[in-house]
């Protein structure tokens, strides 16, 4: 099949002169190319197993955005969104073009977003066949041949074998993820990690969509039989994937969505799931994808003889990943869309053990907790001492939020008020004490709480206001002991509870100082208060 003229001319404009171009190859051909080029190996059942070392995760310190007049005052510059200048970008572009000369390239024309009113046409250019398959898994694939009228709104050039030189290229390492919004171009080099491709486009959508009144969200989403839609925000380890995977509800998507005036829609055509320690019992749907032709298993160890994957083996990394089309998961949406959310759930893992397991939020509280993006983790276990550490990631996705967080929070506030959306804080972390003393809230109890939210039960029960965090706690949840609902009552030492609550309140207050001048009085007053803590 001859290469379309619009692709040839675009490659020329990008200064790319490859030996050959493989355009929009489908899975079987990409498998052949990847295996012929020794880019991976087959696992039992059909997945393609690849390696990304030394980078087995994103490299946020190597991500830069070109700072020019058109975007300078619209981007939240800092450690997350590091600026670079156009001369540096253009120099890197030239060096990468030299690297690509005479090599084979793979091109995929796809879309980011299922809603045709807001979708972004993307062109993904890679030097690895498996990266082309990754892109085809993760983005929205065309129903038929790509029309000659296809014009990419953004282009990713991923030349993973190119290694940047920090002295010459203005980088911090051999890896480079450079974004030029004005030229609609992303350059990725020096890293084989597939997630850089998908997250670079997600960052672009986080810049572009607010201007169209669309709230980009780092969340999962599902839909009930009656068309009711729920959105789940949550950082790693909070249970976002587990709790949104419900056999009685249709999965819209597991990671990236937009909320427009038409409702919720998935940005992606696939999933990029963590694979460490999964079993048919713990994650049956996700485990099933590991036996499918077309799935990519990143950094998963396989038996050299049987080629059976060992998902418990973290020899390379704990961040083993699987990339697969969304339809490999049973009961997924056929059009990637849902209505306006009836419920928004913020999931947090509170290692302090002081947040209630479920509580309803006012719109102002929802904006406060959205801006905070709180979860917690255990800092260490030295000498048997486990100290919880508060972690905040604004909008539950700080690494990908290009604009000021208040832009996204204001959009969220507008939408939940306009559509009368109920918002909830669900703590999937500790109860009865902090990490090392208490225990994790039982998954069955958390599922019962989520079920009661989604079926409307919690909207009708009496509430009690938590005096510390100001949250509205349901007095009853079917299937959950009443004693579990009020965290102070689960502690053997109430004074110890108060002390840990003080620590978390202080952490919230310190973190929110960043946003105090950017939000109204109502949102500022929606956080926890030390004055109400007993003792």
From Swiss-Prot:
Keywords: ATP-binding, Cytoplasm, Decarboxylase, Gluconeogenesis, Lyase, Manganese, Metal-binding, Nucleotide-binding. Substrate binds at residues 58, 193, 199, 321. Mn(2+) binds at residues 199, 218, 255. Pathway: Carbohydrate biosynthesis; gluconeogenesis. The keyword Ribosomal protein does not apply. Its EC number is 4.1.1.49. It catalyses: oxaloacetate + ATP = phosphoenolpyruvate + ADP + CO2. It is found in: Cytoplasm. One of its GO terms (biological process) is gluconeogenesis. Binds 1 Mn(2+) ion per subunit. Its main location: cytoplasm. Belongs to the phosphoenolpyruvate carboxykinase (ATP) family. This is Phosphoenolpyruvate carboxykinase (ATP) 1. It comes from Salinibacter ruber (strain DSM 13855 / M31).
